[in-house]
Amino acid sequence: MMNKLGLIIVSVILALIQTGCAEQSTWMSLNSSNPRIIWEVKPQADLENITGEQISTPEFKMSDYVKGVVPGTVFTAYVEAGIVPDPNYADNIYKVDETFYNRPFWYRTEFELPSSYSEGKRVWLHFDNTNRFADFYFNGEKISGTKTSTKDVSGHMLRSKFDVTNLIKKSGKNVIAVLITDADQKKTRKAKDPYGVACSPSYLAGAGWDWMPYVPGRLAGITGNAYLVVTGDVVMEDPWVRSELPTLQKAELSVSTDIRNASSSPKEVVVSGVIQPGNISFSKDIRVEGGTTARLSINKDDIAQLVVDHPRLWWPNGYGDPNLYTCKLTCSVDGKVSDVKEMTFGIKKYEYKMVDNVVGYPVLTFFINGQKIYLKGGNWGMSEYLLRCQGKEYETKIRLHKEMNYNMIRLWTGCVTDDEFYDYCDKYGIMVWNDFWLYVAYNDVAQPEAFKANALDKVRRLRNHPSIAIWCGANETHPAPDLDNYLREMIAKEDNNDRMYKSCSNQDGLSGSGWWGNQPPRHHFETSGSNLAFNTPAYPYGIDYGLSLIHI
């Protein structure tokens, strides 16, 4: 049996570096799970007149800090430190002074470059999610926005990526400081805005909901993975494998990726890839000017192998196996590997048709791979109300949905930003009705441009997941016309309309609004849903629906 010291050594190695042969880029976790990383958290007010440039230097010492949790929230850090009584017990969470947490906080950590780093390589600092606003500093310099700007990164789904090559120290301590600012809306539990919707894009339920308490700080923090990647000058961004299915016996694949040249000189780049199973190999050359990004696309006209005979199709739970493929992409310059990306995807085809139900009313019906699907599922409100659900815990929760014979989860207001949620939905054949972050009072969205930027990042980040079955604009309402039009046009471009965009979760033919409108079972078979009076089409299954116990 491995002793404790051995386990620690292995954990350090795995957390610090993931390498493989000469082709793999160096990757280093900056999460709290890395035993060499300690995040320090402290209110900005306690560091008055001290700048981010000062905090992000080795000479600065942050005293009386709370140990941060990354990914996580400011409030969670105080809970884990034992400063706040267990908020799950009794009414403890209602006794917390929310004003202490509803203000800006500093995060700070130090690290050293891994020994595998070699001179001349490009170093990138990544943050997958920060809520609600973030300003970033590195080794004494502000790296986000401008020197005079604040709240540079706006929204909980927006990825941040910084080229820190010229600031990184090859030996000795490197320092990161992040100023996290909470949302501007609903600063107290009793604020007039009942749901704090105007803070979108954010975790809306953090401001309190009819099924969830108000969370002090409203889930502000570094809520996604933080990590360092070392590459060459040329990197790939947002790679995408798209599948078309003319017949069940033949699939046509296309591969695209943005190629970013971070150097000042032009580069001749070779992008090669391998898709498994099937050992489908391909490559294509592209010239990328210095300091620019170019789009590379490869399809069946370039590579005949991208036409796949007898593909292994992805099916939802109960209709077949949720088969998955992997695609490993490598970009090289002058025969040397500059970047490597690997993604998982599924070959499938979603269709949405108006089909008459048993009493002759047309209802919108889901098909996948030509097969009509009877949807079974429910709402997913929050993975955990303090964002403490991570990693393998998602597998347990998604697997249980499969074992309940569900095949769909409605992701209420897009409340999950963790990639693992979608990974396990892919694995277990659970389709996702994927909302954006809007609710009823759509005109109150304070920053529509931030909303659009987050929405674009969401689609690019998630579109490889075969489990995503539909994009939905808003919960129980329509987005404002400007946002609605943007979402529709953006999804048509970025996801090629492979999945439907639906404006509203419970109107325009949808058949229910959860336990607000319980119906007897016969309602689902004899009528077209809650819009019967207007003779408008409805779904055969109301994704918000519940059945009252007296009817079961």
Each model region followed by its residue ranges:
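Solvent-exposed, conformationally flexible loop/turn segments
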Residues: 104, 171-172, 250, 289-296
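Substrate-binding/catalytic cleft of secreted carbohydrate-active enzymes
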Residues: 408-550
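Intrinsically disordered, low-complexity Pro/Gly/Ser/Thr-rich segments with frequent PxxP/GP/PP motifs
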Residues: 283-310
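Active-site-adjacent substrate/metal-binding segments within catalytic domains
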Residues: 76-113, 117-126, 131-138, 144-153, ...
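Accessory beta-strand-rich segments of carbohydrate-active enzymes
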Residues: 37, 41-46, 77, 81, ...
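Bacterial N-terminal signal peptides
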Residues: 8-17
